[in-house]
């Protein structure tokens, strides 16, 4: 990926307005909404972080809650929004956000993995039974331009480890203070 990669055209499939519980675990009654990359990233400074999957140990127990707690610190440094993206569908991402009691971070579904593929972060996790997933990373995006990437160690297909540190909110905040 070039040093300053511009995020141009991409449509994300969100579910909005689902409120009627169905089967004890899924909420329905809403509708599909296309949200473009333009809407998410144009004229904004955004921290986007990606992780292998909703409801997984590091993602649920450490990464997502840490970003939600650090939200005000990001805002104080001029960040407009903090987004979490994962190769999961909108139903999964919404259920995960609800289960995590998110207050600040917005979750973005990348069910088809197209955005992750365009970012060059799509990896195989067949060794864990996950299939195609995102590598763990974070990005500082300013008006659709990726200004900085924090990519976890060991990038590759079917790795045994699950490194987490470079893309942690603490590390990103430390770097943002120096920019």
Language-model region placement:
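Chalcogenol-based redox active-site neighborhoods
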Residues: 1-179
């Amino acid at each position: 990926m070039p040093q300053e990669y511009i995020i141009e055209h991409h449509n994300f499939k969100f579910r909005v307005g689902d409120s009627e519980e169905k089967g004890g675990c899924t909420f329905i009654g809403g509708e599909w909404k296309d949200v473009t990359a333009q809407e998410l990233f144009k004229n904004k400074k955004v921290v986007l972080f990606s992780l292998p999957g909703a409801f997984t140990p590091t993602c649920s127990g450490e990464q997502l809650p840490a970003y939600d707690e650090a939200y005000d610190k990001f805002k104080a440094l001029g960040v407009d929004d903090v987004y979490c993206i994962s190769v999961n569908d909108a139903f999964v991402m919404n259920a995960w956000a609800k289960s995590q009691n998110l207050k600040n971070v917005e979750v973005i579904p990348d069910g088809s993995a197209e955005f992750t593929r365009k970012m060059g972060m799509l990896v195989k996790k067949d060794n864990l039974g996950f299939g195609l997933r995102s590598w763990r990373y974070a990005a500082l995006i300013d008006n659709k331009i990726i200004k900085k990437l924090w990519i976890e160690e060991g990038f590759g297909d079917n790795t045994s480890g699950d490194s987490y540190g470079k893309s942690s909110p603490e590390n990103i905040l430390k770097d943002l203070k120096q920019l």
